[in-house]
Amino acid sequence: MSIRYIDEIENLSGKKLFMRVDFNVPLDDHQNITEDTRIRAVLPSINYALDQKAKIILASHLGRPKGERKEKYSMAPAAKRLSRLLGKEVKLASDCIGDEVKAMINAMQPGDVIMLENVRFYAGEEKNDADFAKALANDCDVYVNDAFAVSHRAHASVEAITNCFPVVAAGFLMKNEMNYFEKAMKNPIRPLVAILGGAKVSGKIEVLENLCDKVDKIIIGGGMAFTFLKGMGYNVGKSLVEDNLIDTAMKTYEKARAQGVKFYLPVDCVVADQFNPAAETKVCPIQEIPEGWMALDVGPATVTLFTEALQNAKTIVWNGPMGVFEMDAFSRGTFAMVSAVANSYALTIVGGGDTDVAVHRAGEYAKISYISTGGGAFLELLEGKKLPGIKVLEDKGHQ
C-alpha cells in the first residue's frame, strides 16, 4: 500500500480534520517559545486544509508530563504562536478528550482551528491505548499525521487512533521528510557520504551497520569516535569511551572496509583538562592525547581531512555534532563542518536535534537542502526501520 497525502483526500469542505502535529518546542522560564521551526513546518498542511474549508483540530504533546496535567506543559504557548503565524485565532481547548471538547468541536465553523490540550496529560497516549485513542478522535471525519518527529513512537495519537477513521493521510511535512529520505537512501546520486557525530556510539551503532551497505564514505566525529580510536589501540586519555561497545564498533569498522566503504576518523583533536568552558585546552594529534585529558572537539587537521572527503560528494547525510559545540572552545569543528556541508554542491540532508541547532546557530540553514524535524525518527529511518506512524499510513493509505 502507498501513503495517501492530504491533497489526495476528496472534498474536505466542512469536514472535521484531526491533525497530529509535533509542537514539542523549546520554552524559556517564562513559557516563551525560543525556536518555532516545528510549528512553521506544518503551516503548508494547515493552510491547505483552511483553503479547503475544513474544520481543523490539532493535537500535539509538549515535554514529558508523564500522564499528569502540569500547566508548564500546556499547549497554550504553541496555540498563541500558531495564531500569530496564521493571522487568525487558534482556540485552545481545556482538554484533549471529554464532553466539553466534543461540544467545542461540534460548534466549529469551516475554517476554524482548535488546538487540543497536551495529549501526554493522559497515560493512555504513551501506552497506545485504544480507548484513549477513540476518545481523542472526538468523532472527527479525517485523520492526518504531519508529525514526523514522533512517528517512531507507537503512541495513541500516532498509531492506535488510525483505527478510528475511515480516511487517514499524511501531511506535506511528512511528504517532504519521506521524499528527501528516499532521495538519500533509496536511489541516491553518488558518491553518498554519511557524517555521524554526537557523544555515544550506542545511539548510532545500528545506523552504522545499516549504512555500511548503502554509502560510499562514512565520516565519524564527536565523542563516539573515541570508542573506535581506543579499539584501534590509541590511548585516548579521559575521552568518552563505551568500553562495552569497542568490539562491536571494530566489527562495524571492518565490515565497512570489507565492503569498500571509506571510513574517516579524527586525526587530531582539541583536548581539555576538564569538562568546563573555562578549561585549559590544546590541539594535539590523536597519538598524543595527554593522560587525564579529554578530547572535546575535532582538530584543524581533521576538519581539513573531513572537508576533502566531502569534495566529490553528490549526496550528504549528517547526524550529530563533531564536538561539545555548546561551549565556544569546542565549537570550531562542528561549525567548520556546517560550512563544508552548506557550501558543497551535493544534496544535503541534516538530521534533527543538535545538528539542526548547530546549523541554525551558524546561520547556514538556507544553504542546506533539507533539515529534518525529527531526531529519533530520522535515526530510526537510517537504521532501516519502519516507523509505526508511517507503517499505519501505508497500510491504510488507499483502502
From Swiss-Prot:
Keywords, sorted A to Z: ATP-binding, Cytoplasm, Glycolysis, Kinase, Nucleotide-binding, Transferase
Subcellular location: Cytoplasm
A UniProt-annotated Pfam family: PGK
Organism whose genome encodes this protein: Citrifermentans bemidjiense (strain ATCC BAA-1014 / DSM 16622 / JCM 12645 / Bem)
GO MF assignments: ADP binding; ATP binding; phosphoglycerate kinase activity
Residues that, per the record, bind ATP: K204, E326, G352, G353, D354, T355
Cystine bridges: none
Annotated protein name in UniProt: Phosphoglycerate kinase
Lineage per the UniProt record: Bacteria, Pseudomonadati, Thermodesulfobacteriota, Desulfuromonadia, Geobacterales
Gene Ontology biological process terms from the UniProt entry: gluconeogenesis; glycolytic process
CDD domains according to UniProt: Phosphoglycerate_kinase (cd00318)
